[in-house]
Amino acid sequence: MAFDLTIKFAGEGGEGVISAGDFTMRAATYLGLEVVTFKSFPAEIKGGYALSQVRMSDEKILSQGDGFQILFAFNGEAYEVNKPLLKPGTVLVWDGPEGGDFEPEFDWLEKQGVIAYAVPMSKLAKEEVGASITKNMVALGAASELFNIPIDVYKEQIVSKFSKKGQDVVDLNFKALDAGINWVKNNIKKADPYRLPERMPRKDVIILEGNEAIALGAAVAGCKVYAAYPITPATTVGNYLSELILKANGYVYQAEDEISSMAIVIGASFSGVKAMTATSGPGISLMQELIGLASMAEIPAVIVDVQRGGPSTGMPTKHDQADLYAAAIGGHGDGQRIVIAPTNVEENFYLTVEAFNLAEKYQCPVLFLTDASLSLRVEAIPTPNIKEIQSKLINRPLITKDMNVDLNEILRYKVTETGIAPMLAPGVSPKPYAATGLEHGEDSSPRTRPDIRVKMMEKRFRKLQNIEDENQHLIEWDLGDLQEGDKADISVIAWGLTASITKEAVQRLRKKGYKVAALYPKLLYPVPAKAIEKVASMSDITLVPEANYTGQFARFVRMYTSVRPVQLNVYRGEPFIPAEIEAKIEELVGSKVNA
C-alpha cells in the first residue's frame, strides 16, 4: 500500500504556520518522498487565519487531497475551522493543556475517533524557551518526535534561514525544537499509526515553488528584460527572476505602475529581446490597451497573470480562476492573443518556456494564467535538461544587416500565407519601421483604406488560424483504457490547477468502474474547438469544473463549439478538492459497481 500522508499547520498569521509547513515539506523531500503543498493566508501582515498543508507520498501526487491525517492547531480558530474535517483516525495536536486559547471538546473527539495530543506550544515557547515567537519550532519538535520526521533536516533549515541573524538566534530555535521533543517524550503515549518512512534513494529532483518555476522558465527561455509593478500574488516572480536574469546580462525594472511595465516590455521586445511582465487581475485590467498595442504592432510579449479573487481588490491572497475573460477577450477591438494555463508547478516551468516560444513564433502577446494557490504550491519536480530545452527554443525570424536582402523587398508587415513576416529591430536590421497602434500597410505606414484594413486584419488573424493543429502538445488527453470510438460514461474538461485536482478524481472513479474521457487543455485561447468536440462526442455528458462563479471556460465551450457542458464551480477562495469533482460525476452518471 502506498504511503500517503497530509500534515496541516493552522493558526494565526504571524505565528509561523507557513514556515512550519515549509520546513516539513523539505524534510519529506529529504526522505525521497513526493510532495505537494497548499498554503493560504490573509492579506493582513499579522493576524487572520493562515494554514500550510503538506501532502507527501512515495507515489506521484496530483492534488492537495481531500483533507488531512494530522492537524496542528495553533489556536482556537484553527480548531473551529478544521473541526468538520476531523474524521475517524485523524490526529489533533493542540496548544494545551495550558497556555493556549482553547480546549477541544474531548467527548466529541472521542466519539469521532479523533486522537488528540496536548502540546503546550505557547507556554513552552514563552516560559521554557523564553521567546513566544518560537511557538512554531516547538510544534516542529513535537512533530519530529511523534511522526518520525528527521530532526536533523529541521536543524539544517534553521541554520540556513537564521544563521545571518547570529548563532544566538539559531540556538534559540534549537532550544524550541528540543522543548517540543522533550514534552512529547515525557508526556505523550503515541496512539496513532502515522510515521514517516525511512529515507529512500534520492531522486534527481529540484524543489520549486510555483512562482519560482515561472522565473526559472523565463530565464531558460532567454528572457532578457523583466518589468513589473509589485502586486500580490505575483511579486515573487520578479524577486526570483532578478537573481537569475541579472546573471545572464538581463535587466529587471520595477515600474511605477502596471501600464508602464507593459510599455517597457513592448519597447524591449521591439528592440529585439525577449521580455516579460507578471501581475494579477487588477494589473491585467490596466494593461489591456497596451496588450492591444502588442497585438496590432505584432510584437512578442509574455504576460503572466497570477490570478486572485476579484473583482477590484477582492481577495489578494486567495485562489481563483476568474481572469479568463479578461485575458482572452478583455481588450477593445479584434486583437490576436494567446492564452495558456499550467496545471502544476512543473508545468509552470515548461509552459513559461512555451509562452516565449509561442510569442516569438506568432508575434503576439501571450498571457500565462496561473493562480494564487499554484504560485505558492511547492513540488519536487524532475530536474530539467536545460541544454535540451534551450536547443529547441524558438526565436523570431529577424532580418539583420549582414543578410543579402533588397531593401525595397523588406516589408515588416508583409502579407504572407501564414500571416507571419520576418521582424526588424533597431540597430540590427538594415531598415527602420514604425511599430504603431494605428492600422497600417505592409510597410508599417498608417493606412485607413478599406481594402488595406481588410487585408491586414485577415493577415493578423491568419497567424493563429491553425494554432490548435500546430500545438497538439498543449492539449493533454487522458482516455484511460478507452480507445477512439469507445463510449464513455462522461467526458470531463478541466484547465489550470483544477485539471490536476480533476486527474485525481478521475483516477478514483476509474477504479470504481467508471469510463471517463478527460481533456486537459493548456491552450485556452484560441479555444481548441476540435479537441473539445472530439472528447465530448465520446459521451452524452460533458462536465467542466472551474474555480469561478460564471463558468468562464464552459461558456467559451458553448461559444466556440456545439457542446453544451454541465458546469461545476467553486468560488470560495480555495481550490476544489478531488472528492467534490468525484461526487459530481457520480451524481451525473449514477452509481457504478466496480467489475
What does each of the following model-derived ranges do?
Residues 86-92, 97, 112-114, 250, ...:
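A short helix->loop->beta-strand "cap" motif at the edges of active sites that frequently abuts
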Residues 1-221, 225:
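Active-site cofactor/cluster-binding pocket
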